[in-house]
């Protein structure tokens, strides 16, 4: 569990440098795949924490009752378990999305000249010309 939430604990610049060196060794620096993997690494702690908290409060007697009434495991998961844990999964996904959208440091390390994401474009706009349109985003 500590390994999964370590990107949340370690300072962002250290995570960015570590992810860059790892992606460079793997040949994924300055690629879309490398950027996506970096966002997955940085968003995973938020999903793990919210889904773990949701599952800790989950009542397993409901799934046992469904199994005792003859429901197969796939049907039990789709009709009972998933609707009950869906708020935690959605909130974890939203946290991961907001973190990914806000992430500039790691993407500045990983993105080459041809890769432009929205945070990099916003950073470039702030650096080159101060525009009030960036405040609205």
Give the residues covered by each predicted segment:
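Hydrophobic/aromatic residues in alpha-helical transmembrane segments
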Residues: 2, 15-19, 47, 93-94, ...
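Transmembrane alpha-helices
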Residues: 40-41, 47-60, 72-102
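A structural signal for multi-pass alpha-helical bundles of membrane permease subunits
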Residues: 15-26, 50, 94-100, 111, ...
């Amino acid at each position: 569990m500590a390994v999964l939430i370590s990107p949340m604990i370690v300072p962002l610049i250290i995570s960015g440098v570590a992810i860059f060196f790892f992606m460079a060794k793997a040949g994924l620096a300055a690629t879309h795949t490398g950027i996506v993997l970096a966002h997955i690494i940085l968003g995973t702690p938020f999903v793990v924490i919210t889904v773990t908290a949701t599952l800790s409060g989950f009542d397993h007697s409901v799934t046992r009752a469904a199994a005792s009434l003859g429901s197969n495991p796939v049907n039990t998961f789709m009709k009972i378990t998933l609707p009950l844990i869906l708020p935690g999964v959605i909130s974890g996904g939203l946290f991961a999305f907001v973190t990914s959208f806000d992430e500039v440091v790691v993407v500045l390390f990983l993105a080459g000249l041809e890769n432009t994401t929205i945070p990099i474009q916003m950073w470039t706009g702030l650096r080159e010309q101060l525009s009030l349109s960036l405040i609205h985003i």
